[in-house]
């Protein structure tokens, strides 16, 4: 070979060894991914409390939050439902109590507008959960942009609401609930993350930044609470068929809320596709395979990936604006 005449045999052997080491690392990583997704089970939720222990779910009236509440009730947890619309909370509470009447599942509700960030609302939440044996907190409350929008055109109110709801709301609720968990030496804090925070996302810059903040905060909190008996996990997801995503059809990469939540609760403590992030899980297999492929091929923050992400959201914005224009003409 030509290389034999240019490079010493020892150098070629060394390069071959490095290549084999890299390939072996990728193979092992992929095997670990498959085991985490399809073979190994997650932590038993009974670890966080016996039947009748409470779970607090924010953003509980629709989508993923509603599904978390229903499935946790099915597993024997009493549920504290927190969201903005009281009528929806009352309907869900009645649905849960009727559906699981034989299990004596209890519910409590609190209607609060997280965008308002009112001290009195958080005082009510504290009064509601004080004295309850809360074993699980699901930080699901969140808001995105109405449609993809350039940052410099983002309405100030929308920008403020996203940061206040996604960041301050999550932090303040956790600060109320977590001390009791630490005192009881058991608990699970699940926070909903997003691929929008993992991948830099042009035209969703404020939302992307808020979810990236939650990633760093949750991982830091996990490090702080290690050894206390309280588990912290940020759950990464790509698209799910919810009102926020405005997607109705499921696919290999887009589950419905029921499937996504069922997988998440079954895989607590398993990293799934989030192999390079402590205290983080990407539990749904379609999302996890996508994450692994990107991290091991194109990378996450490179210009090519960012440009592709921008193109996708520019297309979504264009279609949304055309639809709004058509609807305006019909009105």
From Swiss-Prot:
- Compartments, record wording: Endoplasmic reticulum membrane
Membrane topology recorded in Swiss-Prot or TrEMBL = Single-pass membrane protein
Which coarse location class describes where this protein primarily resides?
Answer: endoplasmic reticulum
This protein's name: Very-long-chain 3-oxoacyl-CoA reductase
Task: Read off the lineage from the record.
Answer: Eukaryota, Fungi, Dikarya, Ascomycota, Pezizomycotina
Q: Name one GO molecular function term.
A: very-long-chain 3-oxoacyl-CoA reductase activity
Which residues are the active-site ones?
207 (proton donor), 211 (lowers pka of active site tyr)
Q: Which family does it belong to?
A: Belongs to the short-chain dehydrogenases/reductases (SDR) family.
Gene Ontology terms describing biological process: fatty acid elongation; sphingolipid biosynthetic process; very long-chain fatty acid biosynthetic process
Q: Which UniProt keywords apply?
A: Endoplasmic reticulum, Fatty acid biosynthesis, Fatty acid metabolism, Lipid biosynthesis, Lipid metabolism, Membrane, NADP, Oxidoreductase, Transmembrane, Transmembrane helix
Briefly state the protein's biological role: Component of the microsomal membrane bound fatty acid elongation system, which produces the 26-carbon very long-chain fatty acids (VLCFA) from palmitate. Catalyzes the reduction of the 3-ketoacyl-CoA intermediate that is formed in each cycle of fatty acid elongation. VLCFAs serve as precursors for ceramide and sphingolipids.
